Structure formats: structure tokens, C-alpha cells
Swiss-Prot record:
Keyword annotations of the record: Antiport, Calcium, Calcium transport, Ion transport, Membrane, Signal, Sodium, Sodium transport, Transmembrane, Transmembrane helix, Transport
Molecular function terms from GO: calcium:sodium antiporter activity
InterPro entries cross-referenced by the UniProt entry: CaCA_antiporter (IPR051359), NaCa_Exmemb (IPR004837), NCX_ion-bd_dom_sf (IPR044880)
Phylogenetic lineage: Eukaryota, Metazoa, Ecdysozoa, Nematoda, Chromadorea
Family as reported in the entry's similarity comment: Belongs to the Ca(2+):cation antiporter (CaCA) (TC 2.A.19) family.
Protein topology in the membrane: Multi-pass membrane protein
Record flagged with keyword tRNA processing: no
Subcellular location: Membrane
Cellular component, GO annotation: membrane
Signal peptide interval: 1-23
Transmembrane segments: 88-108, 130-150, 164-184, 196-216, 221-241, 451-471, 479-499, 522-542, 551-571, 581-601, 620-640, 649-669
GO biological process: intracellular calcium ion homeostasis; monoatomic cation transport
Species in which this protein is naturally found: Caenorhabditis elegans
Protein name in UniProt: Putative sodium/calcium exchanger 7
Length: 672
């Protein structure tokens, strides 16, 4: 177990040394540039007449504009290379590095981020739609929002169009390509109110920004404050709608219980009058309501119990459960629905009534599988091994326990089901998975006190490292923030040592690991996204593609890869409505907070923020509005079920946008 720790430590030291020794690096490996002839640039714009040495000096002097904010300075590496061969090799290595990062962010989203989201949603007992526009939106949008904050606060004279360009570009990509991917993966019935609500809020925010660009040439304080207020109104609307939904659900439950009692009384009455032979005992399902308890509900036939037994047997071999295959209860133990045949044919509950409760069905994700319905938690928990019985710290079981929890290889059962491509990806992902397990608490694993102690030190350190605050000093004469992080780690370690036992799982272990795993997953996604942006920025500088086109295309794609991976992962788990809510609510969150928060801070700092709109951004706002209107109109046209033809429409809109941008950049399309 020493080797993984050494590998992780060396990786951290290497990356930190690269970042902290940035200034020394320029003087050691390259000729010290004369930055006085290269004033601070807001965009990385290279003159075609410059020599390679001048280009190298320029990118060294303007690393804030020519780099993406990650640790590895790819633009400097390539532009300051000693030969063309070295440049080509560095570009190839950079592309390979970016592909590995894509694999890493996919693993982080699928294996760590999604399970944490699922557990948090189950713990808070919130619906798919609320989860999509809060936790998933924050998780997906963290790189974009933090990127917007960094770009605005790092410049003495920030420009609104540059900061919003990537937010708009990412929003268009998500509302067209990501939404279409969700639909192609699994056509689904739309959660009408929440989806239309999100689309309308998005259109209002977009219209307000267009108004500001047309009638103002600078940002004033009331503009970002309006966006923050709009987001607050949005959150209130979401919570209010959920409260109304819960009241309707409880009223429906009482109505259904009354119908059930009447049906049972009628059935027993007919039995006592007309029965000739003894009737078989009718299996019963007892349901309790906290506010209004009602008598037991008997199902007319034994089909439900047989189906439940069959699904339980199937679960022992496949660990998969059909979404509506069993009797379902929500977190409070209330009746949500029965098997469709029993529900519709025997209890007289309409399809619309049964769908009313679908949104609140309890679900738990364990080891990549969704468990939903009655006893979802107990079924899921059955897959989580019990804590290893470790008698003392001197036991060899300590190392064995750590080895099992940190094992980066896929489980034997999953390995047998993989195809060749998946196995290759699994091999590539061995080292990233080890790093993830060292720094991301995973609530699917059994309790391990040694691992928890290790996380107490690795998580605070990596959190500071991921946001590049590891060596920052909060005030003059203060040590780096890593010292304060170490102090926090020591306190956590003492608490763990005193208040937990080796072989007994603490009471709130799952909840704490879910929330901390959520935060650390976001930290990894943010770090990986920054590194991807660095490589993409290098490709743009090398190819001399304009900043606008780069931001609206390649940067938008790379920044949105987390949205695509996370949303598709949720769809495959059987929750397309949550993914749809995140696909619309995520970019909406990014726009409202990505404009509202950083520009409010910048205006409070007294900065002047210009607002100009060029032809490329006009196209972007236009096509983003078209994509939102297409979905808004397409929902009722398709009878509230998004199907594959709608995905084709969204893809066509995005392709048309790319074509118009190319025509505008090449001068074929001229704006008056």
C-alpha cells in the first residue's frame, strides 16, 4: 500500500511544483521575455508577422489570456518548443492527455458523482426535478461558474461579452446536443410544469441580457443583481411547486385508500353471500401514513407477491430492478403506487393519478445500479459488505481493509460483462480510479476507519489543490492555506480516532460520505475541466482560431463534457426526467449565477465592465433562443413525450449555428 500513496504524493508534488515555479520556469527553460513590449492582453491574439521567438515571449507574458487556468501550461510548452518536431510531439501528447482526461471525468461522474447525488436526493427526499435543478445543476455548472468568476476577477477591466460567450456557447451545446443525446438514449414523458418553467426562465434571462447588450455599453450594478434575484425567484418557484405537488399526492393517497377500503368491503360482502367453496387467503400489504394512518390494504390477487418474489430472485443474480416492477413507497412509507395491472384494474386508480406520484419514488444507486421502490434501501444495502472485523490497529487486517477499499480494478462480475473496448478503458482508468478513491469518499463502500483517517488528510489538501489555493496566503506574513488545511485534517483525524470504532459503522457515516463525496467529485471535475481547457486553448492558439469561435465551439464542448457524461449516466440509470431538468436547469444556473455573482463582486470592487456584442455573439443568442423555443413548442406538439424526431431537430439547429458562425468568420455573412 506504500506504492499508491507514493505515486499520489509524487503526482501532487510534481503538479504543484510546475504551478508554483511558473516564473522560474520561464527563466530557466526559455530566454527571459521583455514583457514591456507586450502589454497585458485580454485575448490571446497573435500577429501573423511575428517570429516564433516573439510568439513565445507573447504567450509567456500573457499566460492569463493564452492558458486555460490549469496546472500544465500547454500553450507555452508548444509555442516555445525548440523545433517543429518537438512542437508536433507536444501537440500529440496534449491531445492524448486530453482524451485521458475525458475518460477520467467520465469515471468521476459515473462512479462517484452520480452515486453521491442519488444518496443525497434519497436522504433529503426531494424529487427528480428539484434534484436536477439544484445538486446536478451545481455539479455540472461548477466549472463554468468558477471559470466565469476567475475570468472576471482576474482582469482589471473585464468584458461581459468574453465572460458570457462561453456560458452562452455551453448553454447552446447542452440545450441542443446534450438534450438530443438524452432523447436518443431514452425517449421519455416530460415533466410538463418543471420543464416549461425552466425554459421560460431561461428565455426571460436571455431576453434580458439581449436587452442590456442592445441598450447599454457597460454593466451597472442593477444588472447582475437582477440575475441573482431571478435565480432566487426561480428557486422559490421550484420549492413552491414541490410543496403543491406533495399536497396533491397526499390527497390522492387518502382518496385511493378510501377506494381500496370500499373495494375490500364490497369484495368481502360478495364473498360472504355468494361463496360456495373456501376462498384462498388474500395476501395483504400494510401501509402506514404518518399523518393519517389507515387500515391495511389487501390486493385482490397474489400476483403482486409473486412478482415481488420473482424480482427478489432476479436481484440475487443480476442486481437490477425494473422501474415500476414492485410495490413502491416514498421516503415516508406512504403508498406511491402498485404494479400497473393491480393498480389500474383492481384499485381503480387512473394512469394520471399514478403518474402524480412517480416523481417522488425513492431510489438508491449502489455499485452503478438503481434500486427503486419498496425496501429500496434494504435491497441496496444488501450489496454493501459489512465492515471488516478488525480487532486492533496491530492487526494485519488494517492493510487488507485498505487494499480492498482502494482497489482500482473493476469487480469480477462487472469485468466478465465488459466488452473489449470497456476492458481497455478499465485498464486506462486504473490509476485515475486509485486517485479518486484516495480523495473521494464513496458511500457505496463499507465503513473503514483507516480509509476515513486517510481521507481526513487527502480531501482538504486536494480540495485546496483543485481550486489552486494550496499555496495561496490569506494575508501578508501568513503561511500557505495548506497549513490551515493540515490543521483541519488533524482535528478531523482526532475526532475520528476518539468517536468511532474499527468494526462498527458510525450512525451518520453514509450521509457524511455522500455530501463529502459530492464536494470532492465536483473538485475533481473542476480540476479536470481546467486541464482540458488548457489543452483546447493551446490547440486554438496553435491553429490561430479566433477567441470567439474557440469559446463558442471547442471550449464550450470541453466545458460541457461533464454535463453530457453526467446526464447520460443518469438516463441510463432510468431517470431521463432528472437528466432533462439538469440539461435545462444547469445552463440556466450557469447563466444566472455565472453573470450575477462575478459581475456583482466586480462592480462592488469598482471595476468598469464593458458590454459589446459582435456578429458571432448575435448568432449565438439567436440560435440559443431558437433551440429553447423549439423545445418549448415541441413539448405540446409531441403530446408531452420527447421522441427521436425532436432530437434530430435540435441537432440540425446546432449544425446550422456552426455553419452560420463559419460564414460570419470568413466574411461570407456580413452584418450591417
Amino acid at each position: 500500500m506504500a506504492q499508491p500513496s507514493i505515486l499520489f504524493s509524487l503526482t501532487l508534488i510534481f503538479l504543484i511544483s510546475i504551478k508554483s515555479c511558473d516564473a522560474k520556469y520561464r527563466t530557466s527553460f526559455f530566454k527571459t521575455p521583455n514583457c514591456s513590449i507586450y502589454p497585458d492582453a485580454e485575448k490571446c491574439e497573435l500577429n501573423k508577422t511575428w517570429t516564433q521567438e516573439q510568439v513565445c515571449d507573447y504567450v509567456n507574458c500573457n499566460d492569463n489570456a493564452c492558458e486555460g487556468g490549469g496546472y500544465l501550461l500547454w500553450t507555452q510548452y508548444v509555442e516555445c518548443a525548440s523545433s517543429t518536431f518537438s512542437r508536433v510531439i507536444l501537440i500529440i501528447v496534449g491531445v492524448i492527455y486530453m482524451l485521458v482526461l475525458f475518460i477520467m471525468v467520465s469515471s468521476a461522474a459515473d462512479d462517484f458523482f452520480s452515486p453521491s447525488i442519488s444518496s443525497i436526493v434519497a436522504h433529503l427526499r426531494i424529487s427528480e426535478s428539484v434534484a436536477g435543478v439544484t445538486f446536478m445543476a451545481f455539479g455540472n455548472g461548477a466549472p463554468d461558474v468558477f471559470g466565469s468568476i476567475a475570468s472576471v476577477l482576474s482582469s482589471p477591466t473585464p468584458k461581459a461579452d468574453l465572460a458570457l460567450g462561453e456560458l452562452f456557447g455551453g448553454g447552446l451545446f447542452v440545450t441542443t446536443m446534450v438534450v438530443s443525446t438524452i432523447i436518443l438514449t431514452s425517449p421519455f414523458d416530460v415533466e410538463v410544469f418543471s420543464t416549461i418553467r425552466d425554459l421560460l426562465f431561461y428565455l426571460v434571462a436571455l431576453s434580458f441580457l439581449a436587452f442590456c447588450f442592445v441598450f447599454y455599453n457597460r454593466v451597472t450594478l442593477w444588472m447582475p443583481l437582477t440575475f441573482l434575484g431571478l435565480y432566487l425567484l426561480y428557486v422559490i418557484t421550484v420549492i413552491g411547486a414541490q410543496a403543491v405537488h406533495n399536497r396533491k399526492r397526499k390527497a390522492l393517497q387518502k382518496q385511493n385508500s378510501t377506494k381500496s377500503r370500499k373495494s375490500i368491503k364490497s369484495l368481502r360482502s360478495r364473498k360472504s353471500i355468494h361463496s360456495v367453496a373456501p376462498m384462498p387467503v388474500i395476501p395483504e400489504i400494510e401501509v402506514h401514513d404518518q399523518e393519517a394512518p389507515f387500515p391495511e390494504i389487501s390486493v385482490v390477487t397474489g400476483a403482486i407477491d409473486k412478482l415481488k418474489e420473482h424480482m427478489a430472485e432476479k436481484a440475487q443474480t443480476t442486481r437490477r430492478y425494473t422501474k415500476r416492477a414492485s410495490f413502491m413507497v416514498n421516503g415516508d412509507g406512504n403508498l406511491n403506487g402498485l404494479h400497473p395491472y393491480a393498480t389500474h384494474n383492481h384499485l381503480g386508480i387512473s394512469r394520471r393519478e399514478s403518474e402524480l406520484s412517480d416523481e417522488d419514488e425513492e431510489f438508491v444507486v449502489i455499485h452503478g445500479h438503481v434500486f427503486q421502490g419498496h425496501e429500496a434501501r434494504s435491497r441496496a444495502a444488501s450489496l454493501v459488505p459489512e465492515p471488516m472485523q478488525i480487532k486492533s490497529w496491530r492487526s494485519k487486517d488494517i492493510l487488507k481493509d485498505l487494499a480492498e477499499h482502494l482497489d482500482p480494478r473493476p469487480e469480477a462480475e462487472d469485468w466478465e460483462e465488459m466488452n473489449i473496448f470497456s476492458k481497455v478503458m478499465a485498464y486506462i482508468n486504473v490509476v485515475p480510479n486509485l486517485l479518486f478513491k484516495l480523495t473521494i469518499p464513496l458511500n457505496e463502500m463499507s465503513w473503514s476507519k483507516p480509509l476515513t483517517l486517510l481521507h481526513a488528510f487527502t480531501c482538504p489538501a486536494f480540495l485546496l489543490f483543485s481550486i489552486q489555493f494550496f499555496l495561496e496566503t490569506p494575508f501578508s506574513g501568513s503561511p500557505g492555506l495548506w497549513v490551515y488545511g493540515l490543521a483541519v485534517s488533524i482535528v478531523l483525524a482526532i475526532l475520528i480516532m476518539v468517536f468511532t470504532e474499527l468494526s462498527v459503522q458510525p450512525k451518520y457515516y453514509k450521509e457524511i460520505y455522500s455530501y463529502s463525496g459530492f464536494i470532492m467529485s465536483i473538485a475533481w471535475i473542476y480540476l479536470i475541466s481546467s486541464e482540458v481547457v488548457n489543452v483546447v486553448t493551446m490547440l486554438g492558439v496553435v491553429s490561430r482560431v479566433s477567441h470567439e469561435v474557440l469559446g463558442l465551439t471547442i471550449l464550450a464542448w470541453s466545458n460541457s463534457i461533464g454535463d453530457l457524461i453526467a446526464d447520460v449516466s443518469v438516463v441510463k440509470q432510468g431517470y431521463p426526467r432528472m437528466a432533462m431538468a439538469a440539461a435545462i436547469g444547469g445552463p440556466l444556473f450557469n447563466l444566472l449565477m455565472g453573470f450575477g455573482l462575478p459581475f456583482t463582486i466586480a462592480k462592488l470592487q469598482g471595476k468598469y465592465i464593458s458590454m459589446t456584442i459582435n456578429p458571432t455573439y448575435r448568432l449565438l443568442i439567436l440560435f440559443l433562443a431558437i433551440s429553447l423555443l423549439a423545445t418549448l413548442i415541441g413539448i405540446p406538439v409531441q403530446k408531452f413525450r420527447l421522441q427521436r424526431p425532436h432530437a434530430a431537430v435540435l441537432i440540425s439547429i446546432y449544425i446550422a449555428f456552426i455553419v452560420f458562425v463559419i460564414l460570419s468568420e470568413t466574411g461570407v455573412l456580413v452584418w450591417n
